[in-house]
Every structure is written in C-alpha cells, then in structure tokens.
Amino acid sequence: MPVFQNLRQMPKAVIVDIGGFTADYLQIKHGEVDLSVCDSLENGVILLYNRIRSKASSDLDILLEETDVDAILLQGQGSSYGEEVAALVEYQAQEFVNDMLGALRERQFDLRTGRVIFVGGGACLLRRQIEASGKVAHPVFVEDVNAN
C-alpha cells in the first residue's frame, strides 16, 4: 500500500525531507496537510559533509570527498577506508542525526508517537543513523529520491 494511503488512517504524521541544504518538515493530520506546521531546518547533508571533511582533515590529516563520505555511510563500518576513518564518519553522522531529531523535538514533534516519513537522498544516506538513534519509534523511509 502506498505511504499516502497509510497516512490517511493516522491521526498525525510528519514528513521530513533531508536535502542538501535543509531538512524540510510538514505535518499531516488524518491525511490532510497542515500548512501551519511546515518549515525548514538548517540540517542539510552538505553541512554534514563539511563537518566530516573538516574533522577528518584536522584529526586524521586525510582529505575526504563527498563521494567518500557517501561510500562509508552506505557501506557501514566494514568499508575499505579503514576503521579510524569509518568510525569518524559514522560518529559525525550519528551526531548530525541526533541534532536534527532534537531540533524536531524542540518544535514539539513527538517522534515516538505517530509516524515519521523520511524522504530525499539524505534520508536514504542516513537511514542507519536515524534507526539507531532510538528517537523515532516508527520511521518510514521512501527510497525513491524523486518521490518528494
């Protein structure tokens, strides 16, 4: 069943689109969009890339590109970049996700009730970190990055 059909049966849900520059969110109540509850957070994956690249350069004296970060996050700890580099990337990504979810919580979204639908390329990239955070009880991921 498509995600939207499921949303119509839920009292409330929030859609989070993690993009390059921002993470946009929109609340849905009983299948209806609530435009009074939509905004953007300054939590796009480009910020994450920049944090990781800076930390890797200063701490490990290594120059990572965005494609390197993507490869590590999509492969997990068993990447070919080495344990130290992979651990740094994984840690920074988890901190980034925790900050983003904390910002949503500050905006009065209870992520442990209802559904949180993650869309966009950033959501696919950070899926493991979102699931590992323990802050979202029922995450739903839309894998098609063009679906939003």
Task: Please report, for each region that a protein language model flagged, where it lies by residue.
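Nucleotide/phosphate-binding catalytic cleft detector across ATP-hydrolyzing
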Residues: 1-13, 32-46, 68-74, 79-116, ...
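PRPP/pyrophosphate-binding module of the type I phosphoribosyltransferase fold
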Residues: 10-20, 25-30
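Short glycine-enriched loops at secondary-structure junctions
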Residues: 19, 122-123
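Glycine-rich phosphate-binding loop plus the immediately following alpha-helix
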Residues: 24-66
